[in-house]
Amino acid sequence: MLHSGMVLAAPQSGSGKTTITCALLAAMKNRKLAVRAFKSGPDYIDPMFHRQVIGVPSRNLDTFFSGADQIRELYGYDRESFSYSVIEGAMGLYDGLGGTQKEGSAYHLAQTLDLPVVLVLDARGMGRTMVALLAGILQYDRDHRIIGVILNRTSEGFCRTMTPVIEKELGLCLLYTSPSPR
């Protein structure tokens, strides 16, 4: 691993990756951690939110436009000034160029940088189907790199009920829950 960091990814756009990324960046900054942010792909809007939260520029890393060596060089640039990096994925975890190729996906970026993935799942309106969805994602590629899940738009009670199920049936750690807006 080049540097301590993680990729926040999701099954699809609209899952709350940007909100969760900004909340995580703010929490790390509040704990006086020297954190920096990246966005996978060419998106320029989300990096502006990252910068607003942490006060330092957020950079783009795109495995379609840049080769593996250049990606590692860009990620490693100025790393001694930071203790941790958070990379926000784009679209779904495996959605690269045109939504059909691995190149350009958050997964490909995590592979290239040898980083773990934390999956953000919008669990609103789901019960056990959420476990089936996660199981499918985990089985799709055995090198999924997923170490944990953040459930977005759900309740504390639901998470208390589902945490043992997720941990026992999937071997995943439930890292955080984000409540539904009222």
Q: What are the language-model segments listed below?
A:
Residues V117-V120, L175:
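Short hydrophobic alpha-helical runs that function as membrane-insertion/retention elements
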Residues R153-L170:
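GTPase G-domain guanine-specificity segment
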Residues S40, T154, P181:
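Hydrophobic pocket-lining residues within nucleotide cofactor-binding pockets
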Residues L2-S15, T19, L25-L113, L121-G148, ...:
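ATP-dependent carboxylate-amine ligase catalytic core
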Residues I147, C173-Y176:
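Residue-level detection of beta-strand scaffold positions
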Residues Y176-R182:
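Conserved small/polar residues in nucleotide/adenosyl-binding loops
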Residues Y75-G76, P164-V165, S178:
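Short, surface-exposed amphipathic charged segments that create phosphate/polyanion-binding patches used
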